[in-house]
Amino acid sequence: MLRTLRPALVLFAALTLLTGVAYPLAVTGLAQVLFPEQANGSLIERGGTVIGSALIAQAFTGEAYFHPRPSMAGTGYEANNSGASNLGPTNQGLVDQVAARITAAKEANPGNYGGVPADLVTASGSGLDPHISQAAARWQAARVAKARGLDLQRAVALVYEFTSPRQLGILGEPRVNVLAINLALDERFPLAH
């Protein structure tokens, strides 16, 4: 019986070492050499302190900042709670949430008479999407400009500066990283305290 089990046990041990040890170490090593920033989480540092990741949304509130998409990942965009609400488009709970977010967005951005961009009132699949559409950023630009004492054209120019194009020219939509644009606002146009 041991003679018949031996090949299976050897194959099991070999595949465990190959796929459980060698392959992960090789991929991690290659990632560290070829893409060190991305392999370490695309962390953003200021003054030697990590303040966030370009891949994870952060909660920004107040008139002087661009706001990210709503998150279903807890109140603070908690990565360990990542996930969608799992509410279908006809679920009354989702309809009520979106209606409340539309009202709040219109109150926070007076003077915007067009429709609220969908990504400002709907959560992403992960609940942690760090990007908003260019339209969502432009929609908030007047509020941010007023709160910071900027000309609207400067705020809109900043939106265009921080707009990333479609991936490979065809995938997705142009998007704005909320953390990156808000950090630029604080560096270039600091708030008077």
From Swiss-Prot:
A GO cellular component annotation in the UniProt record: plasma membrane
> Where located?
Cell inner membrane
Q: Where are the transmembrane segments?
A: 7-27
- Originating species: Rhodospirillum rubrum (strain ATCC 11170 / ATH 1.1.1 / DSM 467 / LMG 4362 / NCIMB 8255 / S1)
Q: What is this protein called?
A: Potassium-transporting ATPase KdpC subunit
Subunit comment: The system is composed of three essential subunits: KdpA, KdpB and KdpC.
Function summary: Part of the high-affinity ATP-driven potassium transport (or Kdp) system, which catalyzes the hydrolysis of ATP coupled with the electrogenic transport of potassium into the cytoplasm. This subunit acts as a catalytic chaperone that increases the ATP-binding affinity of the ATP-hydrolyzing subunit KdpB by the formation of a transient KdpB/KdpC/ATP ternary complex.
Q: Which Pfam families match?
A: KdpC
Q: Which family does the UniProt entry place this protein in?
A: Belongs to the KdpC family.
Q: How does it sit in the membrane?
A: Single-pass membrane protein
Q: Which UniProt keywords apply?
A: ATP-binding, Cell inner membrane, Cell membrane, Ion transport, Membrane, Nucleotide-binding, Potassium, Potassium transport, Transmembrane, Transmembrane helix, Transport
GO molecular function ontology, one term from the record: P-type potassium transmembrane transporter activity
Presence of keyword Cell membrane: yes
Main localization (coarse) = membrane
